[in-house]
Design a protein with these regions (language model features):
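Active-site regions of metal-assisted phosphoester/phosphodiester hydrolases
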Residues: 1-39, 63-64, 69-73, 79-239
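Active-site neighborhood of divalent metal-dependent phosphoester/pyrophosphate hydrolases
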Residues: 43-50
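Glycine-rich loop at the start of a catalytic domain that most often binds anionic cofactors/ligands
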Residues: 54-55, 88
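Phosphate-coordination/substrate-recognition cap region in phosphate-metabolizing enzymes
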Residues: 57-61
Length: 239
């Protein structure tokens, strides 16, 4: 039997409505519905804490979609208590999920902003199984090198999707080890697309990669202004 599903990568800027500058779960859920996504990998998501501004954002959006499966991968705790990281929401059961820490550069080589990052690694119960990786890379080259090394070491042998905001343009040589292992679905765009900022994008830093044993039916970055990033969407199929 051929399985066909739609995946979406989305940096939500902690579910901040780009126009109103307020937390807006409805517009995030509506964006997912408009894209018809079955599995969504998020970056810049909050989770529950004592601070009322920190809610279980993946759970809230999943409930608005009527999806029953979600996972939050904590990368950092702001102020030591407020969890922040990546998340996954799925129409299909999540068989397993784990949070893999990306090592911080030590020592730091640059003067820019540094932040601890992580890789969300999950297996979804769809068809014969699908491995999904979600990450948000740092801004500095040494952070990005550590992220690429971590991701490449966790790419499984079959049926894999890697998605996220990698803070790198496609021609960045640091990204090449990923390009060599997986297929960049941007080649299936109907025309070249950029992803950030959402109202007038100047760069493409958001990605969905797939392994060679899945077929890409279509891919796009829709012109949607909800978060500060546009969503990246791909439909794949496999037997």
């Amino acid at each position: 039997m051929i399985m066909k599903i739609t995946l979406m990568s989305y940096n939500t800027q902690h579910c901040l409505n780009y126009v109103t500058r307020k937390i807006d779960f409805d517009i995030m859920a509506d964006t997912i519905k408009r894209c018809g996504a079955d599995i969504i990998g998020f970056q810049e998501m909050r989770d529950q804490s004592q601070d009322p501004a920190y809610e279980a954002q993946a759970k809230i959006i999943a409930e608005k979609l009527g999806y029953h499966y979600y996972y939050f991968a904590e990368a950092i705790r702001f102020a030591g208590v407020n969890p922040y990281g990546n998340a996954l929401i799925s129409r299909y059961p999540i068989l397993s999920a784990e949070t893999v820490r990306i090592p911080d550069p030590d020592p730091r080589k640059y003067d820019g902003y540094y932040e601890t990052r992580c890789l969300l690694k999950a297996t979804i119960d769809v068809g014969s199984g699908l491995h999904v990786l979600v990450s948000h890379f740092g801004l500095n080259p040494d952070e990005q090198e550590n992220a690429v090394e971590t991701v490449v070491s966790h790419i499984p042998a079959d049926r894999c999707v890697l998605m996220g905001d990698f803070n790198m343009k496609p021609d960045n040589p640091i990204l090449q080890p990923v390009m060599q292992k997986l297929c960049d679905t941007a080649q299936y765009f109907p025309s070249p697309k950029l992803s950030f900022p959402s109202d007038s994008p100047r760069v493409k830093i958001d990605y969905i990669f797939v392994s060679s044993d899945v077929n890409v039916c279509c891919a796009d970055i829709p012109e949607i202004v909800s978060s500060d990033h546009r969503p990246h969407v791909v439909t794949i199929e496999w037997e």
